[in-house]
């Protein structure tokens, strides 16, 4: 099965189409005002109908209310919901299989009991104090060799065109997620880097027989 590729932090229709043309499977929209890549539901609603067809649209939320997630999901026709804050398993349960739960990783203990999350997939990101992602930092991928990963899982945190090939070969994830690693500036995607990133993932999976 091909490794799935999600490009997060899309802030414009042009970047959405560039991600599609590069070969990404999914795009992420950040509905978190604290991020330099934040968009509003009203912005997205204006160009949602012009987004590439057959591309999964993921909305990223950080400690948002269930009501706001629901209204944003409806207005923007989101396919998946990524919960990237301090949400509990009970809060995740409301969204079921359409939810992706971000797990911030710094040590082996952060990967214990992942089966408790009632979601469709897990996203493993670097744990940086005071941050909810998008830092460009990696975590120690060797920790994954000791972990039980009961659901489809997505590798995130510090990935870029230069290291993602090695990452995919080493840990063989269901998918990879990139944001700052394919930017020219926060919130502005570098279209050449997106093409290079996707090409590196495909080289890795071809070499590993994935």
From Swiss-Prot:
InterPro entries: Aldolase_TIM (IPR013785), PRAI_dom (IPR001240), RibuloseP-bd_barrel (IPR011060), TrpF_fam (IPR044643). One of its GO terms (biological process) is L-tryptophan biosynthetic process. It comes from Magnetococcus marinus (strain ATCC BAA-1437 / JCM 17883 / MC-1). SUPFAM superfamilies: Ribulose-phoshate binding barrel. This is N-(5'-phosphoribosyl)anthranilate isomerase. Pathway: Amino-acid biosynthesis; L-tryptophan biosynthesis; L-tryptophan from chorismate: step 3/5. Keywords: Amino-acid biosynthesis, Aromatic amino acid biosynthesis, Isomerase, Tryptophan biosynthesis. It comes from the Bacteria. GO terms for molecular function: phosphoribosylanthranilate isomerase activity. The gene is trpF. CDD domains: PRAI. Its EC number is 5.3.1.24. Belongs to the TrpF family. Pfam families: PRAI.
